Amino acid sequence: MTVRLVGKEMPVLPAPPESGRSRLEKGCVYLPEGTREEQTVLLREFYKEQAHAYLSLRAEEWAAHFGIEIRGVKITSARKRWGSCSSRGGLNFSWRLMMAPPEAIDAVIIHELMHRIEFNHSKTFRALEKKNVPNYEACQKQLRETARHFSDI
């Protein structure tokens, strides 16, 4: 079995019994052995951990780049929405976003950060988005392709 993490296919291998937890090492995902249902739960938890670390870092980097203040990043299990932004500056991202390529992940992060400037989807917002993510359409296509992989997790 393989999984997709930040756009890369990675093999899933059994973790040594003494490790007791999932981990990423040398381009492989190691999961403790268990039933299919247990492995699915472990894989989701692995994705959530990876998402929190990666997306928090990227959101902070992009926020600093744009001079935008954010109030934390939360990881959700949303299936229909990649991300959202609260009026108070909290960013929410689905852990499933971690399956997308890095440029598509950044496009979603930047999209949500632009809501800190323009809290709607007006023409002004779209102009900001286009200026800061010139390849937004290509990223949207990548995200649609990524969404096809949701069924098994």
Segments from the language model and where they lie:
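Active-site-proximal or metal-binding-adjacent scaffold patches in catalytic folds
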Residues: M1-A107, R116-I153
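Walker B catalytic acidic pair
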Residues: E112
